[in-house]
Amino acid sequence: MYVLRTHLCTQLGEGNIGEEVILCGWCNTYRDHGGVIFIDLRDKSGIIQLVSDPDDSPKAHENARVVRDEFVLIAKGKVRARGTGLENPKLATGKIEVILEELIIENRSLTPPITIGDESVGEDLRLKYRFLDLRNPKAYDTFRLRSKAAIAARNSLDGMGFLEVETPILTKATPEGARDYLVPSRVHPGEFFALPQSPQLFKQLLMISGFDRYFQIAKCFRDEDLRADRQPEFTQIDVEMSFCDQEDVMGVAEKLLGDIFSACGHTIPEHFPHLTYDRAMEEYGSDKPDLRFEMPLVEVIDLFGDSNNEIFAKIAQDSKKNRFKALKVKGGDLFFTRKTLGVLEEFVKKFGAAGLAYIQVKEEGLKGPLVKFMSERSLSLLLERLNPEVGDIIFFGAGEKKSVWDYMGRLRLEVAKQMGLIDPNQLCFLWVVNFPMFEKDEGKVKALHHPFTMPKNLDCEDVEEISSIAYDVVLNGVELGGGSIRIHQEAIQKRVFDLLGIAPEEAQEKFDFLLEALKFGAPPHGGFAIGFDRLIMLLTQSPSIRDVIAFPKTQKATCPLTSAPSPVSSEQLKELHIRIKEKTQTH
């Protein structure tokens, strides 16, 4: 038998009945039915049933008897239809089988510690044996789609005149780079490279170089606490262009995403709706709202100025600092019980709420703990503003605006999930625009996006009122990516550094190459980056970003497969001029 397959398993169908074929793969399952042996052969495409009958080929049957799970097999045989009533509708090849004429055991396997495709196996064990976990055809389908998406991205950007350029992986640490991964330099003792959190500065330098349109599918690194959609090393589609405005950049992003989704079997709108940052926060409590369902937050702070509750009345006195949000849930009073309302209250308490007030709309009128704290006039205005119907429930959140936005936005999502209001197959894109340039965190001014974003009203006295030409693209409540128009004038860049508390000496030390480049005729430019792993996670409806990365890290930033990170030898440390400080004993 030639060691050369003629088909992949799922390339065979009823049209191949009677043909001789050679297949290669792994034994997925093995069954001995009193002499006749059935082997489910698995390759990257899927599974097909092999049948070994001693009357057809004694030698093949002799080999088949010793086959066990995950043995590597090369099988030659003839395709035939399965018997009436023996078809398997769960398999793409469920109407046919292959009668073995020859069988080669190319390699044996130990008993696998995990069952291929068994999703009940713990993730740590699956990642430790990731090379086995990836044998699942479902995993192969994920990475085939990932490959299609990457090819589509390259073709799309190439078609729009973008040039693919690779930027350095070993680069310079920056002031905001507390989450940088550092690489010690052997030839420069005591000095370190940083792995890039993004190619931001290099792609700006390429615009100053006159490259006009750049892209790369870039590896990026960030040493941060992990969540379901975060990894310490990740991939992004990175794009930058010159002589453009915000609409130009967004148009390129929409065309790129349209081409990627088309290659993956989806049709999406040519253009996405826009939502300002302020409106997103006020109406949805999030700068990445999920708009697959209605249910906006409504401001009602003006209805509590005359409340007989001192706390509510005090909150209502400062409408700049505070918010009082109402969330009308259609049919919510019929859906939620006293017990489940208690669960929702505990849910919002985890995110800073003191409790969860509500009003139930019943046939006999309004009921609930909040009714007694509102005047007749305020209740009348509330009904006019929200227009609730019998069977609805209205939830309320009050307090400092950022806190209220956060927990009421989370409540909105949680209610929608519990009530089954979200269509998992719907793709809802939008742009969030007009972001603030800065935010204050414990009194310190920070850039909301990054310090290279072009501000709009830099002379505003209140830094929190300064806005930026920045934009995020959101899909189904997930930030898919974002970008901005960049600062291309040295004076503006220095002013932004100053507002961020970066002293001129520090700015010169850390960003001298950028500030120098801005003196030599930098063009107006802007760009964006799309989180590629996150994009594939959404396209495949995977619960975790780890499912779409071949060899991911755990939520503790470790690799169970390779046991990384790991200690290194004292000789290596010595060469790098590093000494590990011994842990001090505490008693």
Curated annotation (Swiss-Prot):
GO CC annotations on file: cytoplasm
Could you tell me the keywords of this UniProt record?
Aminoacyl-tRNA synthetase, ATP-binding, Cytoplasm, Ligase, Nucleotide-binding, Protein biosynthesis
Task: Summarize where ATP binds, as residue positions.
Answer: 222-224, 231, 479, 531-534
Q: Which reaction does it catalyse?
A: tRNA(Asx) + L-aspartate + ATP = L-aspartyl-tRNA(Asx) + AMP + diphosphate
GO BP, one example? aspartyl-tRNA aminoacylation
The record's section on CDD domains has: AspRS_core, EcAspRS_like_N
Predominant location of this chain? Answer: cytoplasm
Aspartate: annotated span: 200-203
* GO MF, any single term: aspartate-tRNA ligase activity
Instruction: Site (Important for tRNA non-discrimination): give the residues.
Output: 33, 85
Superkingdom is Bacteria
Enzyme Commission number(s) from the entry: 6.1.1.23
- Under which main EC class is this enzyme filed? ligase
List localization entries. Answer: Cytoplasm
Pfam families according to UniProt: GAD, tRNA-synt_2, tRNA_anti-codon
Q: Which residues bind L-aspartate?
A: 176, 222, 449, 486
Signal peptide as annotated in the record:
none
Q: Which family does it belong to?
A: Belongs to the class-II aminoacyl-tRNA synthetase family. Type 1 subfamily.
Summarize subunit and interaction data from the UniProt record for this chain.
Answer: Homodimer.
Q: Which HAMAP family does UniProt cross-reference here? A: Asp_tRNA_synth_type1
Name of the protein this chain belongs to:
Aspartate--tRNA(Asp/Asn) ligase
User: What lineage is this protein's organism placed in?
Assistant: Bacteria, Pseudomonadati, Campylobacterota, Epsilonproteobacteria, Campylobacterales
